[in-house]
C-alpha cells in the first residue's frame, strides 16, 4: 500500500468518536473514507457517513456487515469496546488488513492476544492518539528518572460522565511509563483507591485518582511530590478531534508496515527523545 489515498474504515461510526474520525479522514490529504461500520441492528445502516458526521454526503453508506465492505478499505480504525475490537482484529488478520486500535478497557489476556495477532498483520495499539499525550509519556520517563526514587507519585485523570472504564487507558499508560523508568512493576506498586483509615502512604507506590463528570474530554496530571516542592505534568484535551487526527495519522503510517505491533511512539518517532 502506498502512503497516498489510503482507504480507511471507521468502526463505531455512529458514536461520538466515530463521527470525529469520519471528519478527520475527510480532512486528510493522504486518506479517504472507504467504509463506515456500526452494529448489524442499528437504524444507521444505509445512512451516508458524511451526512451523519455533519460534513455533507461522502458517498459511503454505513454498513452493519464488515464482510460486505472487506474490499473497500486498507486500514480499520477502531474505537469501540474490547469484545468488538477483538472481533475486528481477527477479521483484519484473516484478510491482511491493518488495524488502529484506540479502544481501552482490555484485559491482560486480550492485550496479549492483540500482540499475538500482530505477528501476522499490522497493529497500532495506543491508549491515546494525541501527539501531546504521547510526548507527555516520554517526559514522564525523564521526570521519573530524576525525581522518581524520592518523590510521591500520583496520577489524576478526569473524563466525561459516559466513560465506562477507570482508570483511563491513558492514566494506566502514564503509570506504566513511570514504573518502567523506575524498574518497578505497576501491578505491584499501583494504588487505585483510598477510603477510610488507610494509614500512611506506602513508599514507592504510584497512586491513581479518577473523576467522572460533565463533558470533560480528557485531563491527565502526573504529580511528583517531594518535601518542599512538587512537579506536575499535565495534558488537557479540549476536543476529540485531537485523538481522531492522531488515529488517522497512525493509519497512514501503518499503511507502510506489513505486520508488527506498534504504538504512537513508533508513529511519531519518539524513540530517540
Swiss-Prot record:
It comes from the Bacteria. It comes from Sodalis glossinidius (strain morsitans). NAD(+) binds at residues 12-17, 102-104, 126-129. (S)-2,3,4,5-tetrahydrodipicolinate binds at residues 160, 169-170. HAMAP family: DapB. Belongs to the DapB family. It is found in: Cytoplasm. Transmembrane segments: none annotated. This is 4-hydroxy-tetrahydrodipicolinate reductase. PANTHER family: 4-HYDROXY-TETRAHYDRODIPICOLINATE REDUCTASE 1, CHLOROPLASTIC-RELATED, DIHYDRODIPICOLINATE REDUCTASE. It catalyses: (S)-2,3,4,5-tetrahydrodipicolinate + NAD(+) + H2O = (2S,4S)-4-hydroxy-2,3,4,5-tetrahydrodipicolinate + NADH + H(+); (S)-2,3,4,5-tetrahydrodipicolinate + NADP(+) + H2O = (2S,4S)-4-hydroxy-2,3,4,5-tetrahydrodipicolinate + NADPH + H(+). NADP(+) binds at residue 39. Catalyzes the conversion of 4-hydroxy-tetrahydrodipicolinate (HTPA) to tetrahydrodipicolinate. InterPro entries: DapB_C (IPR022663), DapB_N (IPR000846), DapB_N_CS (IPR022664), DHDPR_bac (IPR023940), NAD(P)-bd_dom_sf (IPR036291). GO terms for biological process: diaminopimelate biosynthetic process; lysine biosynthetic process via diaminopimelate. Homotetramer.
Amino acid at each position: 500500500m502506498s502512503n497516498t489515498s489510503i482507504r480507511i474504515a471507521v468502526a463505531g461510526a455512529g458514536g461520538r468518536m466515530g463521527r470525529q474520525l469520519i471528519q478527520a479522514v475527510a480532512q486528510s490529504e493522504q486518506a479517504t473514507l472507504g467504509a463506515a461500520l456500526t452494529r448489524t441492528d442499528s437504524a444507521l445502516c444505509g445512512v451516508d457517513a458524511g451526512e451523519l458526521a455533519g460534513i455533507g454526503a461522502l458517498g459511503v453508506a454505513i454498513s452493519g456487515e464488515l464482510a460486505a465492505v472487506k474490499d473497500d478499505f486498507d486500514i480499520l480504525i477502531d474505537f469501540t469496546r474490547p469484545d468488538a475490537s477483538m472481533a475486528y482484529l481477527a477479521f483484519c488478520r484473516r484478510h491482511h488488513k491493518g488495524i488502529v486500535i484506540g479502544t481501552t478497557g482490555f484485559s491482560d489476556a486480550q492485550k496479549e492476544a492483540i500482540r499475538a495477532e500482530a505477528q501476522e498483520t499490522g497493529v497500532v495499539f495506543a491508549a491515546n492518539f494525541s501527539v501531546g499525550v504521547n510526548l507527555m509519556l516520554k517526559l514522564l520517563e525523564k521526570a521519573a528518572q530524576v525525581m522518581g526514587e524520592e518523590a510521591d507519585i500520583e496520577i489524576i485523570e478526569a473524563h466525561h460522565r459516559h466513560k465506562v472504564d477507570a482508570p483511563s487507558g491513558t492514566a494506566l499508560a502514564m503509570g506504566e511509563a513511570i514504573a518502567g523508568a523506575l524498574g518497578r512493576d505497576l501491578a505491584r506498586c499501583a494504588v487505585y483507591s483510598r477510603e477510610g483509615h488507610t494509614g500512611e502512604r506506602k513508599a514507592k507506590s504510584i497512586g491513581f485518582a479518577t473523576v467522572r463528570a460533565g463533558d470533560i474530554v480528557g485531563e491527565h496530571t502526573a504529580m511528583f511530590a517531594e518535601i518542599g516542592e512538587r512537579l506536575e505534568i499535565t495534558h488537557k484535551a479540549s476536543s476529540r478531534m485531537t485523538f481522531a487526527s492522531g488515529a488517522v495519522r497512525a493509519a497512514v503510517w501503518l499503511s507502510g508496515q506489513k505486520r508488527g505491533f506498534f504504538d504512537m511512539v513508533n508513529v511519531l518517532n519518539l524513540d530517540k527523545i
